[in-house]
Amino acid sequence: MSLRPTPCADIPANTAAVARAAFPKGNVYLRLRDELGTIFTDAPFAPLFASRGQPAACPWRLALVTLLQFAENLSDRRAAEAVRSRIDWKYLLGLELTDPGFDASVLSEFRGRLVAGGAEQLLLDTLLTLCRERKLLRPRGRQRTDSTHVLGAVRGLNRLECAIETLRAALNALASAAPDWLRAHADPDWGERYAGRAEEAHVPPGEATRRAFAEQVGRDGHHLLAAVTAPEAPIWLREVPAVELLRRVWVQSFCLVPAEAVPAPTPGAPGQVEPLVRWRGEAEGFPAALQLISSPYDPEVRYAKKRTTAWIGYKVHLTETCDEDGPHLITHVATTPAPVADREVLAGGHEALAAKGLLPDTHLVDAGYVGAHELVASRRDHDVTLFGPTPKDHHWQAQAENGFTLRDFRLDWEREIATCPAGQRSGRWRLDQRRGHAVVKVRFSARDCQPCALKARCTHAERRELMLQPRAEHEALEAARAREGEAAFAQEYRRRAGVEGTLSAGVRAQALRRARYIGLAKTQLQHVVTAAAMNLVRLGAWLAGTPLARTRQSAFARLMLQPACA
């Protein structure tokens, strides 16, 4: 498909007349067209199309239709019908009343071009640029960030079900690609074992019988992989995606006991000694959650658990403005695998906001985003104040009523000496590494600690040892903890709660918490378009002068908050 740029023409007279007659008091889409114009043009989408070929549908209109579709949570077919039938859509798109629209498949093709071209952020960024030009958005204010879980567009499977489904997927792929080869190499029993889905399989109860069942599945998969990788097998069979995925899942789910470790067969018994396929348990070890494939139908979904919520899928992070003198607009969206910690996306979010020229002055976040390194890096790299509760101290000294915590020690960073509450100085101060991060380890002498009258409040070990972060991180964390104890902290931090309402609105109105598509890139596109659609709705409300809704309170709560009568 090639792009033939379509000029953003005026609204046809007939369309405008009918729309004004149908909506004499205005409409959100009419208002958006009158105030913001067409929002998009064809130029930013030109790199996504070839220079030759059949003319493509107008991309600026497809972008706008995509936002409307997500704003109203419509399917492709219903969105295409709305283009043909709804006068407010025709007004916003600048179409004639008689315009027949386009086939619903065009929307899927357009999203595919955005993903293939790495342009997932284009729709949101273009809208934000327009808002900056219209003075509806400004940098260096307050912004807030929060995340929520996203269920993948696949059924949740446990490890055994995932192994069975992966083998079934490989067999189905080979049955279509190489039916004669598969019939020649398949075990006759496989037809009964793997004809139905994994949840239909009869898994026997009991740990031992369940492991034996899993290892039978492992032997079947190992047999198939051995046949595929045999020298006489067609080389292209190894390149079938389902076969490669089978290999990866078998590595994470099973291990091989070498043939020499397998007891020799009894004399006269036929056959050759083969490696023993063993189901991986805690003793054998298996990959961390970030590498563990959880479904053969979306290899990028991952398992995660946060407090009482467990899910297979992704996690989405939304950042929005929260200044009182403008609309609250989402400025950045990040979709990650489910196990990725919140604070790991903070640096990337700040870099993306810096590229857009939309960095905040104060960034309100919850405790999951706050760490000593993040406090320093945000201020040093982007001049952003990270504002939120700090990580808690879980050492027993902090939990005890009168224990001596790190705050009770005086630190002389220049002389590299720590002084304990009893006045004793440390004997050793040295740099070290812990989980890839620089730390300072401080040790006191056992000769000072053992006879100390305060030892019971300080340590249960022979001597007290401290683990410090580098000076900049340590001082930033201590300053943030001191700030957290001030009365003004709670008042300022209250502003962060509004982003939870944004997540709630996205979940209820746009199904934000359920992935529509397979794969991380397409799910990221879904979330970016959802954010842009939410911005479109908020802009319409702001232009109409609709005030922000206040937190709902019951009649009883309002009554009890009123001052008592004298």
Annotate each language-model stretch with its function.
Residues 78, 83, 96-100, 108-566:
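Anion-binding and metal-coordination hotspots
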Residues 90-94:
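Short arginine-rich
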